[in-house]
Amino acid sequence: MTRDRSNLLYEDAGRFIPGGVNSPVRSGRAVGTNPIFIREAKGCYLWDEDGNRYVDFVASWGPLIVGHAHPAVVEAVRAAVEKGTSYGIPTEIEVRMARKVVEMVPSIEMVRMVNSGTEATMSAIRLARGYTGRPGIIKFNGCYHGHGDCLLVKAGSGLATFGIPGSPGVPEEVVRHTIPLSYNDLDEVESVMERDGDRIAAIILEPVAANMGLVLPRPGFLEGLRKLCDKHGALLIFDEVITGFRLARGGAQEFFGVTPDLTCLGKIIGGGLPVGAYGGRRDIMMKMAPVGNVYQAGTLSGNPLAMAAGLATLDLLCEDGVYESLEEKTNHLVDGLNEAAGAAGVPVFTSRIASLGCGFFTSEPVFDFASALASNTDAYAVFFREMLNRGVYFAPAQFEAFFLSMAHESKDLDFTIEAAGNAFVRVKELCAF
């Protein structure tokens, strides 16, 4: 499998784009390879500029739960773009999208559209501080909430991949009100809340941490956070940019039965186009301008193309049997990968939930950021390259999840499992455990 065209494009991109990519993890540096450049995608398949085909388990980092270029989504965008690309004036489709989100997500009574998950979390933090009159924010090590300054502390995703604890350019004064704690350690949170609860505006977290690989909440962790927020008058914010509409129609809050005060959304809600949203209780959301005095705005917020793609995607997810089918596919894939790793004698701890999964190259359980970081990233790099050469595209970094879509079929999963069997053999040959 040759990638001459991709390599030439990457070299050319480096002349004009820092690192040759518009988001760091895409570079492939964490797995010792150049990125592939994509020409087109359909269903669960990618084709690169050299004509190589890959079974895709990245799905644009999560948004494409219905698959690439689903006919219903394509037609919705086509119909919208023929009327115009952006107006900067309210449209009916924004109202339809807002109504749909309120119907689907248990905690959301009102919602505001933005253009990215980062905008959603930044806005939710500002709103929480404005509503409570408090400055403090608790976040969790390894949880990634976009690249807003106050949350870029001990974060996951690309910062974990490249070993960056924070970022130059973020002054200490900006993050001094941010308290990073250990995910899944309820006792630590309780201790901080007992000491500083009267200055904590909110606790924000990914209810399932999907930016340090995939780490599930321990039983009682989310429920405990809800109780602590209620006790101390803080808001609970779920960052459901990844889990929203993926774990269930109502996201992780429906899946676990825990209701936050505010919810941040992105990825799936845009159907593959740039979009984000934040919403929650009516009394909190009514603090936003123009009815309240907490300010947030955006030139392209509620963009009609993104609303059209998102609505078409959400309509597809409301069909019968979608989530049951996705979970069945995920179990089939993960069981096959585990069996292949075991046969090759490669230690892998696999985490899965709904249509999300991650294989950590370690024999120890992974339950927080520290245990995730203890996994063998060199082994993952070998696995990634071997799978890529066999026509399967996983995330080019250990600390990212893989995603299944409605477009994956049994033949694609079986193809992937067979490829993994050979890849794990190579991992065993090349890596020390």
From Swiss-Prot:
InterPro entries the record matches: 4pyrrol_synth_GluAld_NH2Trfase (IPR004639), Aminotrans_3 (IPR005814), Aminotrans_3_PPA_site (IPR049704), PyrdxlP-dep_Trfase (IPR015424), PyrdxlP-dep_Trfase_major (IPR015421), PyrdxlP-dep_Trfase_small (IPR015422)
Principal EC category: isomerase
One CC-aspect GO term: cytoplasm
Keyword Coiled coil set for record: no
Record SUPFAM superfamilies: PLP-dependent transferases (SSF53383)
Any one biological process term the GO annotation gives: protoporphyrinogen IX biosynthetic process
GO MF annotation terms: glutamate-1-semialdehyde 2,1-aminomutase activity; pyridoxal phosphate binding; transaminase activity
EC number: 5.4.3.8
Residues with N6-(pyridoxal phosphate)lysine modification: K267
Catalyzed reactions per annotation: (S)-4-amino-5-oxopentanoate = 5-aminolevulinate
Pathway connected to this protein: Porphyrin-containing compound metabolism; protoporphyrin-IX biosynthesis; 5-aminolevulinate from L-glutamyl-tRNA(Glu): step 2/2
Compartment annotation: Cytoplasm
Keyword flag Manganese: no
Family: Belongs to the class-III pyridoxal-phosphate-dependent aminotransferase family. HemL subfamily.
Description of how the protein assembles with itself and partners: Homodimer.
Entry-linked HAMAP family: HemL_aminotrans_3 (MF_00375)
Protein's UniProt name: Glutamate-1-semialdehyde 2,1-aminomutase
Native species: Syntrophobacter fumaroxidans (strain DSM 10017 / MPOB)
